[in-house]
Amino acid sequence: MSQSSLSRRNFLGLTVGAAGAAALAACGTSGPSSAGSGKSTAAYWSLSGPPGQPIRQAAIDRFNKANPSTKIKATFFQNDAYKQKIKTAIGAGQAPTMIWGWGGGGLKTYVDANQVVDLTDWFGQNAAVKQKILPSTFGAGTVNGKIYAMPIETVQPIVLFYNKKVFDRVGVQPPQSYGDILDLIPKFNAKGIAPFSLAGQSRWTNMMWLEFLLDRQAGPDVFNNVFAGQADAWSDPAVLEMLTKVQNLVKDKAFIKGFSSITADSNADQALLYTGKAAMMVHGSWSYGIQVANGGNFVKSGGLGWMNFPGIDGGKGDPSDTVGNPGQYLSISSKSSAADQAVAKKFFSTTLVDDAEKAGWVKSGGVPVLTDSASLFTGDDAQYLKDMSAIASGAKIFAQSWDQALSPTVAETLLDNIAKLFQLQISPQQWVDSMNGVIGQ
């Protein structure tokens, strides 16, 4: 998705007071400064937990071993905590050297505030590095035609996972349409099995349902109008229809009881699927690696199934399209020293595009953003990797997750309204009115 049409209000102009300073102190790093040991020490913040944290740490260890005169120091945070801490740090001018993110609207706010380095010329001078990265992943790292973030790690479509053993036990088949999903809900409930696992407290997990239902109902144009800042874009009739579908799912008990108190960071939603307490789950492709790591023999024994989210009968959307994260991204803080920026660029041009990096993500069950990865799709994970690669490459449109495509200000309002929608605290029309009020911010 091109970022050149973004027009967002800058959230970084806010003053960070004592609360911000306290939050920074809790982060365990002093921000953009280098250590006083004679080495240039570049700071790297990213997400904790499997499967990503061990791979990120392994990359840093490889780099530090190969470059003894420099050092990269990593600090890891859970997903939701990271989003707040990185926002606070950047607003205070205390960002780490390397800023991990999802691109899109969040990156645009950093660019507007001159907080990140323009990498366009660097990639021009290092064409061999750029050629090792899938071209389609650069869109979310590009703002106004310039590259401000390097695509890293994996392509992550959102998919529908299901527990094959539960389906066999109940005697039903995987859904081929949204109508099939609706038919399955009472059948699983009758057997005391939740139709869908959902970590509703995290909010962005709920958002996946809105993204797919709107796309399958109306195609990409409605959200494209929102993204472009068109006034009252959320008032499209397809949005009200989608929101009504969501609330009907809640009323029909499509989701695990107590979903609004379950967090994604705890991986409790994953456990509900692999333990058979839930039959299905809409989640990111990274879920596979979590279930391999935490689910015992579940995946290896053939218990996990997956598919692209099915189409809606009569809908305008193409069921081959997908949504999710076209990649993850690393930017370089413009407030960091020249020496630390040089360390980051060397990390970009060597370790992050080496064969070990590619192999690490494949082994985790991920499809790397790096080219020529298909030859590594072997062993127990081969079919999953091929299928995720096919979904990502076969989609005419691979839309970026809404909360990443929009500005952080709008994204927070979006997520708050989504939580209220799932808790039946607001009506579809109230949701539309609230979201129309922040379009273009």
Give the label of every model feature segment.
Residues 76-85, 178-183, 259-271:
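Short helix-initiation/N-cap motifs at beta->coil->alpha
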Residues 146-152, 158, 182-235:
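Extracytoplasmic/periplasmic solute-binding protein
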Residues 151, 227, 324, 366-374, ...:
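C-terminal capping/gating helix-and-loop segments adjacent to ligand/active sites or protein-protein/ligand interfaces
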Residues 187, 228-260:
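Glycine-centered hinge/linker elements that transmit conformational signals in sensory
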Residues 104-158, 182:
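Hinge/lid segment of periplasmic solute-binding proteins
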Residues 2-113, 124-128, 174, 339, ...:
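Conserved N-terminal structural module of periplasmic/extracytoplasmic solute-binding proteins
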Residues 66, 252-254, 295-363:
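Extracytoplasmic/periplasmic substrate-recognition and gating elements
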Residues 120-133, 200, 217-241, 295-299, ...:
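Short, solvent-exposed loop/beta-turn-alpha elements that line the ligand-binding surface or hinge
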